[in-house]
Design a protein with these regions (language model features):
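Aromatic- and charge-enriched surface segment that lines or borders ligand/interaction sites
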Residues: 20-23, 33, 42-44, 149, ...
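Ligand/substrate-recognition segments at binding pockets and active sites
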Residues: 19-28, 34-39, 43, 52-58, ...
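Long beta-strand-rich cores associated with HINT superfamily self-processing modules
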Residues: 556-583
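Ligand-site clamp/hinge motif
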Residues: 299-339, 343
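Extracytoplasmic/peripheral linker and loop segments enriched in polar/acidic and small residues
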Residues: 103, 492-557
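Append "and occasionally in soluble cytosolic enzymes with long acidic Gly/Pro-rich linkers
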Residues: 361-443
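Surface-exposed binding/hinge segments that line
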Residues: 67, 228-271, 286
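N-terminal lobe/hinge region of extracytoplasmic solute-binding protein
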Residues: 135-184, 569
């Protein structure tokens, strides 16, 4: 332990035992409190005295009482130590202190202090570095592009890795990236990519066609079991035609393959090493349980990122810290433009049709549909940043608000099932908002005699299918990436999607057939019709119950430039920059 941590333990012992700022205690008792030898206790007390934290008056003789006088009351002392931890960038110790049994008023001040630590910081001055520190209240799941499925992790992976092409959703076109050009044969079944020369991975290795082939083969590997493996099904062969030329041979013509090679799942990884090594604008320099550190890639094949360093820190779930890109607040800072974002995709409930249970009964699913009155839930839980959803697309939810729902309708549908009081298991992520939704639904279900058992599980178990295999239904969310059509298809094809996992039997086959037609369709209007048909079918069959979209509004200071948020709610780290104050 560090000296600061010993001092904190001493102050916590003082608080727990209601000692005054002058505390009488033996060296042996102190050794027990701080879990060290009597000799080390004396060394620690001398060092704390030198730091002017306390005065130590040792007792005469072995076993006699010593007197400790703290120079500050416990609130002031804890806050001072907390500031020192942050000044020394010992965020681990600061976060551990937040987890201690402190009074609410002290914790409130610590959270406020921590808030100022995140956001943009400039290190220097001689070697000025732009550093962005971002808090997250949960552990990160995988950043491996072949497996990444969570929106924030997908965004971080985009900063580490690159794809052959990039898709421009607004212009509906594919732009060159790692491949500077590509050809599609007359029959549409052979696609040739021409790779840029001189592109380097973060480990210094030059990218070649062998790395692209390896990336594809790894995604296709049955043993690897990537949730995006379905994207490889239409490819019959891959051939390296030279170090910077590669060909993909398709089983049939489909433009969707260009979408696949633009997706994060096919981001290129080096043939000989896959541990977070990419070609992206940022490289991983540190990755522990509590922090991910990204440094600007100075050898990036395109324009270097303006930010020099990004740190993503895990903080306690109850932390009142919500900054992502904002600068520390300043009284003199002019307000910049607000960026509005309404989540594309939505939270939803779906049912496990792999399990032999009452969820196969339409009337039961309708009972849950009637119970899950989102407009009422938003009102009762005061969740004003939510929009009740009737579609995965917010513009459609606005045009078609939810129909009126009543407990009487829910009770009538439940009665039609012949329900006998059995317990139904509802799974959801062990997160604040998911818990609130699940508890609200459980309470409402009780009013019509429906027994629901809540099963929260951590995000780290997202890919473990056994964790939710015996669930009857799940409360989940889907946030779409900028490539909307691909994101929609992924919702049904991606193995980590609970709609893909749970939608089984004839219902699943029917939906997958229409998804297949959507994949082969190139006309934009016809694509919309297929997506409308799928959503309508899911609604009528009560297979996916849309709940709400999340509305986000971010206000950025005027000095934060080039901010444009993607559908995940993140700004592209490689583009944002801080305009320095000029005196």
């Amino acid at each position: 332990m560090k000296l600061l941590e010993y001092y904190v333990s001493l102050r916590l012992h003082q608080k727990e035992n209601d000692y005054t700022d002058t505390m009488k205690i033996t060296v042996q008792e102190l050794a027990d409190v701080l879990c060290c030898t009597e000799r080390n206790i004396k060394i620690l007390l001398k060092r704390m005295t030198a730091e002017n934290w306390l005065t130590w008056k040792p007792g005469r003789g072995r076993g006699n009482t010593s007197t400790l006088t703290f120079h500050h009351d416990i609130r002031t002392g804890i806050l001072e130590i907390f500031h020192q931890m942050l000044e020394k960038e010992d965020l681990n110790a600061a976060i551990n202190l937040l987890k201690e049994n402190l009074s609410e008023d002290i914790k409130e001040e610590l959270h406020h202090t921590l808030n100022t630590y995140f956001g943009y910081q400039e290190k220097g001055p001689e070697t000025a570095k732009d550093v962005l520190k971002i808090p997250m209240t949960r552990k990160l799941s995988t950043l491996d592009p072949a497996f990444v499925s969570v929106s924030s992790e997908s965004h971080f992976a985009r900063q580490i890795y690159d794809t052959l092409l990039q898709y421009d959703e607004n212009e509906k076109r594919f732009d060159a990236h790692l491949a500077h050009d590509y050809d599609v044969s007359a029959d549409g079944r052979t696609i040739t990519f021409y790779l840029r020369k001189g592109v380097m991975f973060h480990n210094g290795k030059h990218m070649t066609s062998k790395d692209v082939r390896y990336t594809f083969q790894r995604l296709k590997d049955q043993n690897a079991n990537s949730p995006c493996q379905w994207q490889t099904a239409l490819v019959s062969d891959v051939r390296c035609m030279g170090p910077y030329t590669i060909q993909f041979f398709l089983k049939r013509k489909t433009r969707m393959f260009l979408h696949f090679v633009s997706s994060i799942s096919m981001a290129v990884q080096p043939e000989d090493e896959t541990e977070l090594i990419g070609t992206g604008p940022f490289s991983v320099t540190e990755y522990r349980e509590d922090v991910l550190v990204l440094e600007a890639n100075t050898h990036y094949f395109k324009e270097r990122a303006w930010l020099d360093r990004i740190e993503i820190w895990q903080i306690p779930q109850n932390s009142k810290v919500d900054l992502h890109y904002e600068l520390p607040s300043s009284a003199n800072e002019q307000a910049g433009e607000a960026v509005d974002l309404l989540q594309v995709g939505c939270n939803y409930i779906t049912f496990n049709l792999n399990k032999d249970s009452i969820v196969h009964n339409w009337h039961f699913r309708d009972a849950i549909y009637q119970l899950f009155d989102i407009q009422l839930m938003i009102k009762e839980l005061k969740k004003d940043k939510l929009l009740a959803a009737t579609s995965l697309f917010p513009e459609k939810s606005i045009e078609n608000p939810p129909a009126e729902k009543t407990l009487q309708q829910a009770a009538e549908s439940l009665q039609a099932t012949g329900y006998n009081g059995e317990i139904l298991k509802v799974s959801f992520f062990d997160m604040k908002y998911s818990k609130e939704d699940a508890m609200w639904l459980k309470k409402r279900a009780e009013s019509i005699g429906l027994n629901l058992m809540l099963h929260p599980f951590p995000l780290t178990e997202y890919y473990n299918e056994e964790v939710t295999a015996d669930s009857d239904m799940i409360i989940m969310g889907e946030m779409f990436e900028n490539n909307i059509v691909l994101a929609f298809i992924n919702f049904f094809k991606h193995k980590a999607s609970f709609v893909n996992r749970f939608l089984a039997g004839k219902e699943g086959e029917h939906v997958q057939r229409i998804v297949g037609l959507l994949m082969d369709e190139e006309d934009e209007e016809k694509q919309k019709k297929y997506m409308d048909e799928i959503e309508h079918d899911l609604h009528e069959r009560r297979l996916v119950l849309n709940s709400y979209h999340t509305y986000r509004k971010k206000n950025f200071p005027a000095s934060l430039k080039n901010v444009s948020m993607n559908t995940f709610g993140w700004a592209d780290f490689r583009k944002i920059w801080i305009k320095p104050a000029v005196k």
